[in-house]
Amino acid sequence: MEEHARIYVAGHRGLVGSAIARKLQSEKYSNLILRSHKELDLMRQAEVETFFKEEKPEYVFLAAAKVGGILANNTYPAEFIYENLLVESNVIHSAYRAGVKKLLFLGSSCIYPRDCPQPMKEEYLLSGKLEPTNEPYAIAKIAGIKMCQAYNRQYGTRFISVMPTNLYGPGDNFDLETSHVLPALIRKFHEAKESDKLRVTSDKGRNERRKRVALSLRRSAPPTSSDRGERSSGSSVTIWGTGTPMREFLHVDDLADACVFLMNHYEDSEIINIGVGKDISVSELADLIKDIVGYKGSIHYDRSKPDGTPRKLLGVSKLQALGWRPKISLRQGIEMTYRWYVEEVHKMRKVSKEPKVGKGKRRTP
């Protein structure tokens, strides 16, 4: 890509798109085209076609997608397949018609079969049945891959498809009903820690009152551990499933780095995985996040809830052969993400505490 090329990042306000935009800006690409959903609805074909005709992007990063965790995929399967099919179809076809030089389509590691051999190599695509919990989303992503390959074969386009592993980082979705496991755990442990702080503060207040009463009655008995404020919190964080599934996690800034690298160095129609090449169990991940957050309570695994795919580790030898490797370790990445999350929580609290001026009410001078 040339530094002054017109580059469109679809989905620039999402986790992946925002990271790609940041990376491009840091690499001195000065002509980015960015549109919010309000400015451009990618599900509306006419709007997308008009946008490509008027803006004439030369390169496209297709990061716009409807994403979510197990609960969201189970609850909204029709939305996941319908919206993703519309977005990718409109963007890919319009990119072809507008003569875009190159397009990068972001897929997902969930495209691989549920019982796929590990690590999952690119050639294992469509070799078995998909994981039922996210099948509609996976099918939509596979359709996007096949569209890129078909357009390359029929029209000679340069559309590449990358398959990232599980992602996390600043700008992630922390909604407990729709988020993925890592951001959900960060929020759960943080809120449990904050709840315990409030409980301890309340207990200290009660203990001080008890001490004053005890002194007034001249009791000589030594204080209990409860009186010294040493009582355990007794709180617990609940996690879906058994904790045994293995997952691989890549910081979104590393993904963005890989995407820009591949846009400049990869030309094959065949998909290419983007990952770290190492995985961790959900229980090990929970222990790591618990330690980083500083939560002192216990962890409970709700075995009545689904685990999802038993293991998801991407084979990354193809990417490594091109000379790319991630730079951010899992601990470092989670620490960075947790700091960002805490800052966002503080910002929201500050905004919620600001006085609101209602209709017909005067602002105090």
Enumerate the predicted regions with their spans.
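SDR active-site strand-loop-helix element
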Residues: 10, 35, 60-66, 103-108, ...
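Conserved beta-loop-beta element that borders a ligand/cofactor-binding pocket
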Residues: 107-108, 145-170, 183-186, 196, ...
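Adenosine-cofactor binding site in Rossmann-like domains, unifying the SAM/SAH pocket
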Residues: 25-50
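Flexible, glycine-rich beta-alpha linker
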Residues: 111-113, 136, 160-182, 246
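Active-site helix of classical SDR
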Residues: 136, 140-143
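Conserved Rossmann-fold NAD(P)-dependent oxidoreductase catalytic core, especially the SDR/UDP-sugar
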Residues: 3, 89-134, 160, 173
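NAD(P)H-binding glycine-rich loop region in Rossmannoid oxidoreductase-like domains
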Residues: 45-85, 97
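C-terminal substrate-binding subdomain of Rossmann-fold SDR/epimerase-dehydratase oxidoreductases
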Residues: 10-11, 19-27, 191-198, 205-219, ...
